[in-house]
Amino acid sequence: MNQTTTYLEFKTDLFANTFFDVIKKYHDYEVCCEGKLWVPFSYFTHENNITLKYSNQHDEELTLVLEKKNERINATSIVKNKYVEDGTDAFYFIDAFQEVMFDAYFLKE
């Protein structure tokens, strides 16, 4: 199991709130990362927390936990690999996820 934690920091909590709302709205988007297509299959939200679960074509599962605190959104991804590699899936997924959400915000909103 590979785990990575990072964060997005915004200038104000208004921007963080807006981006958090975008994630809630577009939580069902697929994420392509490192040649794998991650498809969402579970979504849970409670106050300032969002938990998303994804699976891919290799029967791997990934859990993304997002927590908003003021102008920062903490993101933790946990990948359950069938064959544990170097741990990069978890890190690259967060980057790919951010890109998908930013695209959704700027292209759809």
Region roles according to the model:
Residues 2-3, 14, 70:
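Asparagine-rich low-complexity intrinsically disordered tracts
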Residues 5, 24-27, 41-42, 52, ...:
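Intrinsically disordered, low-complexity segments enriched in small/polar residues
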Residues 6-7, 14, 47, 52-53, ...:
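Serine/threonine-rich, low-complexity intrinsically disordered segments
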Residues 7-10, 79-109:
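Mixed-charge, Lys/Arg-enriched low-complexity segments
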Residues 10-31:
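Amphipathic alpha-helical segments
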Residues 24-28, 33-68:
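Amphipathic, interaction-prone secondary-structure segments
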Residues 56-92:
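Intrinsically disordered, low-complexity regulatory segments enriched in Ser/Thr/Pro
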